[in-house]
A protein has these predicted regions:
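Ubiquitin-like/PB1-type beta-grasp interaction modules and other compact soluble beta-rich domains
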Residues: 1-67
Length: 68
């Protein structure tokens, strides 16, 4: 089964089902300060491992960058 997601406006395909936590690892942003919105709703960090992504989900992934 191919999982088709839209991430920051771009289509992406993954070979298997993913949780938000799995997606974070796939995108290489684990350990960074991030915010994830799924279909218009913010996903709390405490729920990353429990929220299963579905084919067609639209996600916005924002990585915080420090500066001054």
């Amino acid at each position: 089964m191919t999982l088709r997601l839209q991430i920051n406006g771009a289509p992406r395909e993954f070979a298997s089902r993913l949780t938000v936590q799995g997606l974070v690892a796939e995108l290489g942003v684990a350990g960074k300060r991030i915010a994830i919105e799924r279909n218009g709703e913010i996903v709390p960090r405490s729920q990353y491992g429990a929220v299963q992504l579905a084919d067609g989900d639209k996600l916005e992934v924002v990585v915080a960058v420090g500066g001054g």
